[in-house]
Amino acid sequence: MIRWRWIWFSISILLLVVAQPVSLRLRFDRSLHRMFAPDDPTRTDFEFLHSQFGVSDLVVFAYRDERLWAKDGNGLERLQRIRERIEAIPGVAIAMDLSKIDQMLEQLDQPFAIFRTPKGNGTRHVLLDEDNAITDAFKAIFEGQTHSRQGTLVAIACLLKPANQTTIAVRETLLNLRQIGDSLATEGLEDGMLVGQPVMVEEGFDEIEQDGKRLSIVSTTCLALLILIGFRSLRWAIISIAVVQWSLIMTRGLLAWLAWDLTMVSSMLGSIVTVIGVATTMHWMLGYQRAMKSQSNPEEALRYSMVGLWRPIVWACITDAIGFASLAFAKVGPVQDYGCMMAIASLVVLVGIFVLVPTMALLPVVPKRFAKSLGISYELAQIPGDEPLRKCLLGILKWVNRWPVAVAFAAMVICVIAVLGSLRLKVETDFIKNFRSDAPLVVAYQAVEKELGGAGVWDVILPAPKVLSQRYLDLVMDLEAKLLALEVPGMESLRLTKVMSFADVDHASRASPILGRLSIEARLMGMRQVMGSFVDTLITRPVDEQRFLRIMLRSREQAEAAQKEQLIADVRRTVDEAIRTDEWIVLFGDDAAASKAAVSGYYVLLTQLVSSVVADQWRCFAVATVGIWIAMSIALRSPWMALLTVLPNALPSFCILGWMGWTGTPVNLGAAMIAAVSMGLSVDSSLHYLIRFQRERSDGQSFQAALTSSQSEIGMAILLSTLALVLGFGSLATSNFIPTVVFGITASISMVGGLLSNLVVMPALLILSLGPRSERWKAN
């Protein structure tokens, strides 16, 4: 590699030039239903909902207007102007509000208007007519959907076009809606609010993209500054940045070429590439620094360090790849993709290290007499505090030598307690808690939760006869009454706050002198004329003798996980019981489609999202452990020594999950994959430590001398790389997306835990299993 370094370096630059434009095509898959296994009922029900009604993304545009019900109609006319601006957005399919309902009622009222006694207020708006029965009925139906009970919070329900019907991205549609909200000052109103599951998901993904870029930049910058300040080497600072950034671009280019998309699970791709690249670069740099003390020139020092380090570097990246590849055993597609992506990234870092470092480490930039002052000489300075740090590391080893049994026993006890705690894990189901409490989205949601009856929007899909009958609609309304009666106890009870379907709209329309005299199908045709495609979101047109009716549900988003899961289960049970009654069976006869009902929507998806991601965590963790043990057995040529690495590497993730279990801290997306990630973060250090120990022993060093050398030299590399990465991960604590904050904190804690495990638990296990004390035990 060193002899042909310029050839390899040229090839790497050529690959970089090719991969850079391709990497820009890597996309985010922002669909939530793919976060579930293909056969998961939650996913199949959602896909069924989407296939029947097409439009399933509901966004609520809300604002405050004290004059909404003004007798002069000023409030409704202002609302109409705002709605028409929203309807002009290409990505919006339907916008339903009070002004549209008012227009519909006016059309129904016009043929009989000449027989009405004129009102004293001279209003032109039927919706403002307090003596109109149909007006009162429609106000009641849409309360919580288009306006609050108090009447000051106005809502426009915006149904977005599905992806197959528009080229406009959801992000662009939401941006246009926000621009309208920001312009309400021209109407004399406060800025508008935008809520809805699509809004939460899009904002979450936006934050994740920004956080991934931030972590990559901050982590590599921290490492570069550490090298620049500590070792006074601009050369190696640039090398570390080059390795990480080259690996990132190449990985993203490969994924784009393979037509893979990033998801919410794999969004932290850059962070893991940074971890592997930083740790590997730091180990080689310190190995090169040691070699420079005994070798005559930089090339010999680099060759000497490469001979000593190629094996741990190669196997560290391979074990990383194996650990991540274990996620392919998960049932969820994005988790499988995440594992494959990270396995590829691990191998790309391996290539990047060997094609970039030899050339850049030996690159003659300026004459030697100027190189040192510029920080680009071949030599590296001693890091400030080097001797005290090494003494501290050896002091830890001395203490471990004295109490190895106590250390190992304490580690086992902690591990058992942590495992028991991890069995008590709860998942976070309130997606709004993924944002900071002062975020505009959270403030808007709190208003909707309080005044519109809840921000959780979901649906029941029921089969409907080809020709609607009054008996069928009565059964639907009976079911709605049962759904409204459901209540889940808790500190604050949870129930459905709104239930609405075509049956309610039809019932209210019968108060109209026109529609009340018509058949149900005729009323349906009339409503299609005045309400447009909104009716098609409530009931489908007959296709192959089948049609479906949609019951729109609303409930509080901010509730305990157990309550939300219980409410979903109760709704499913109630619906299942309803479609199995004798009356239902008589109505449909032998039609098999009569039993095809579903409960779905973003509320259901978000409630069960984290549970879906963590469902296979322990199985994947077990596969990763076995895979890493096999790889370590080959690398160390000792299955027993490889087994010694399992506990230190598993301990950090057990401790994090155990702490969350015992304290009742809900697991969100940021902590969902920490077990697999943590294993990959700490195994590299163990491998470097043990291979150095083996090499010292094969060179004739005593057990204690080999352990001391490993603790002093490799321990320093572990300490410095951990410091740089903890600073990088710590930068995520400033994110506005709470799962990113949790990921940064748990990853930092995991790395510190891995550091302690490798510098305390690992030596204790080596002493007990391979040291002089173990030989005495065997003799006894």
Stretch-by-stretch model annotation:
Residues 226, 314-364, 627-633, 655-666, ...:
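Hydrophobic, glycine/alanine-rich multi-pass transmembrane helices and their short helix-loop junctions
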Residues 1-13, 293, 303, 351-415, ...:
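Interfacial helix-loop-helix hairpins and adjacent transmembrane helices
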Residues 51, 77, 122-234, 477, ...:
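Extracytoplasmic
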Residues 8, 23-67, 76, 122-149, ...:
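Solvent-exposed, non-transmembrane loop/terminal regulatory segments of multi-pass membrane proteins
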Residues 291-318, 697-720:
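Helix-loop junctions and hydrophobic alpha-helical segments within the transmembrane domains
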Residues 77-155, 169, 173, 191, ...:
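Alpha-helical transmembrane helix bundles of large polytopic membrane transport and channel proteins
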Residues 209-260, 329-333, 619-664, 734:
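Interfacial segments of transmembrane alpha-helices in multi-pass membrane proteins
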Residues 236-284, 641-690, 730, 757-760:
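Hydrophobic transmembrane alpha-helices and their membrane-interface caps
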